[in-house]
Structure formats: C-alpha cells, structure tokens
Amino acid sequence: MRLADVDDIRRVAAGEDFPRSAAFAVVIGGALASLIAVVSLLSTLKGLPENAKALHLGIGVGAVALAWALVHCVFTLRYAHAYYDTDEQGNDCGGLVFPDDIGKDDQDKLTPNYLDFAYFSFVVGMTAQTADIGISSRHIRRTALLHSLISFLFNTAIVALTIGTIGGMLN
C-alpha cells in the first residue's frame, strides 16, 4: 500500500468493490471475535505461573491491537474507493478536501494516496473527528459516521476490557 501510486489506487478502486455489507460484517465479526477470544484468554489467568500470565496478556493485547488496526485499515480502503470512484463523466468522485487543496484549481489539487486515506481513517477512528480534512460528499460523510460509531463501540469495549482485566488481577 505504501508504494502504490494514484493510478494503482484508481485501478483497485475500479476493479474491486468489496460489498459494503460484506466489509462491515468482516470488520465487525473480526473485531468481535478478537474481543471474545481475549476475554476467554484472560479469564484463564488465575492460577497460572507469572510467565504464563505475561504471555497471555501479551497475546491478548496484541490481538486487540491488531483487530483495532484492522477496522481502520478496512475503512482506509473504503475511503480510497469512494474518493477514486468515477461519476458519469469519468471524473473522480472525490469527497475529501485536504488542507493542501484550499484555494487551488482542480488540476493543482493533491492526488491522495493510501497514506492520506490512512491518516484520515485513523484520525476518525481515534478522535471521532476529521481534524484538518473536510468531507464534501454525502457518501463519505455516511461512511465516516459509521466508522466513528464502530470505533466508539470498539474503543469503549477496549476500555471496559482493560478495567476488568486490571480489576481481576488486583483481586
């Protein structure tokens, strides 16, 4: 992804539109399965030797971190697809306004790459806001709303899991 240029992103966006409902199911299912597995794993901590506890905790933290990153990576691809999808005239749909583009003509505007979409995705996921990138399309606005809600629920579950784990270890 890091080495892909804009033409690569356009080609992928035109050729592969993973259905939204399937993407949603994969992301939510994967994140939920990860949290359930971590809860199951951490429920076995009592009575384990210290080195085994550390291993279980490490695996649990790693699984949650990877599931959290997966959510935002999938939304990175959705934002890229939505941006480089074409309208009836064959132009990019766009929908995100980058700070570098303010006051510039269309031909001088930034052609975002995956890192730009990843930046947007992770900012939405971590802060539930868009920071310095504006949204100018209804489709991306709805995607960002869904992303924010999923991220809020996932982040809340992580906080609850952390508090429960710490509470269980202190008893």
Regions found by a protein language model. Give the residues of each.
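Juxtamembrane helix-capping/reentrant segments at transmembrane boundaries
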Residues: 9-29
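Alpha-helical transmembrane segments of integral membrane proteins
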Residues: 21-28, 54, 58-60, 117-120, ...
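Membrane-proximal soluble regions of multi-pass membrane proteins
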Residues: 83-85, 89-134
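Long, highly hydrophobic alpha-helical transmembrane signal-anchor segments
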Residues: 23-79
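Residues within alpha-helical transmembrane segments of multi-pass membrane proteins, especially transporters
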Residues: 32, 36, 65-69, 74, ...
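Membrane-water interface of transmembrane alpha-helices
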Residues: 1-6, 73-87
